[in-house]
Regions:
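N-proximal low-complexity "stem/linker" segments adjacent to membrane-targeting elements
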Residues: 1-45
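Cell-envelope/extracellular polymer assembly enzymes that use nucleotide-activated donors
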Residues: 22-25, 53, 197
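Acidic helix N-cap motif at the loop->helix transition within catalytic regions
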Residues: 35-38, 63-71, 114, 118
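A conserved acidic beta->alpha catalytic loop
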Residues: 43, 50, 58-67, 86, ...
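Glycine-rich, basic loop-to-helix element that forms the pyrophosphate-binding segment
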Residues: 84-101, 122
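Conserved nucleotide-sugar donor-binding catalytic segment
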Residues: 99, 152-232, 236-237
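Short aromatic/hydrophobic "clamp" motif used to bind/position activated sugar donors
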Residues: 106
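Conserved donor NDP-sugar-binding/catalytic core segment of glycosyltransferases
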Residues: 118-149
């Protein structure tokens, strides 16, 4: 089988002038998340920074996600609801939202996670202060019922290309980048780890800086992709390095092993119990 190279597409960086400095585009894929998505949307609506648009792309949910989201979008025009014609995965859903995004600032929030009310305001202020174009924050873990499990996850203060290859340090729900400086890079077509694949693409252009504040809550669900078997995660990491990062068989294997080591390191060093 031929080893095909993936070339990331970079969408136009032309932004409407009135939005060039303030608008945040929030990228939210969803699939059968009716139980949680209302709470997620409310956490965005409660932001102290109100200049945002929330692009919710539904990957053909079979529950009543559409009814819940439409109730919000009918009363808040900043919420844009898009339904895909076929179930295609989170990468396709996120890419669809990216193509529609009008904001300078691009942020990511999955449909079962939550933001603290000052997340956008504080993170943008931090990025402007240090002139960063790519950043992430600490986040807490919550259980399916929304109760905190007393864990805070952090990471390195600065993540360059080499360190990003070592491990996926940023939590997707905390990442923000400056579209003016970086552009809109297409997420590689991979079922799992597609957020990590995007961070790797962005790391070619800019380092990722940690804003060392807890500004989001990640919902740990037993049925989510993030809770897949350990062996499956290892296989998908190898697939990412081999097929998306175009590494040799040997390099992909070494990077995968390296990821296992740094994953253990992150749990020991950057996971704090309250």
């Amino acid at each position: 089988m031929l080893h095909q190279k993936f070339t990331p597409a970079i969408f136009s960086t032309v932004i409407k002038p009135e939005h060039s400095d303030r608008l945040v585009s929030i990228i939210t894929p969803t699939y059968n998340c009716a139980k949680y998505i209302g709470e997620t949307i409310k956490s965005v609506q409660s932001q102290t920074y109100q200049d945002w648009e929330m692009l919710i792309v539904d990957d053909c949910s079979s529950d009543n996600t559409n009814e819940i989201v439409q109730q919000f979008s009918e009363t808040d025009t900043r919420i844009k609801y898009i339904c895909l014609s076929s179930n295609s995965g989170a990468a396709v859903a996120r890419n669809h939202a990216l193509k529609l995004a009008q904001g300078r600032w691009i942020a990511f929030l999955d449909s079962d996670d939550l933001w603290h009310s000052d997340k956008l305001e504080k993170q943008i202020a931090y990025m402007k202060k240090i002139n960063a174009s790519f950043s992430y924050t600490r986040y807490s873990e919550i259980r399916e019922d929304g109760e905190h499990n007393n864990k805070i996850i952090s990471g390195p203060k600065k993540i360059g290309r080499i360190r990003m290859l070592a491990y996926c340090w940023p939590g997707c729900l905390t990442v923000m980048y400056d579209r003016k400086k970086i552009g809109l890079i297409q997420i590689p077509p991979i079922k799992k780890n597609n957020d990590y694949a995007l961070w790797l693409r962005i790391s070619h252009k800019a380092p990722c800086f940690l804003f060392d504040k807890t500004l989001a809550s990640y919902r740990k669900r037993s049925g989510s992709i993030s809770s897949s078997s350990y062996i499956s995660l290892i296989e998908w990491h190898y697939k990412l390095f081999r097929e998306i990062e175009n590494k040799s068989v040997f390099s992909a294997a070494i990077l995968t092993i390296n990821n296992i080591f740094w994953g253990i390191y992150k749990k020991l060093i950057y996971t704090h119990r309250l």
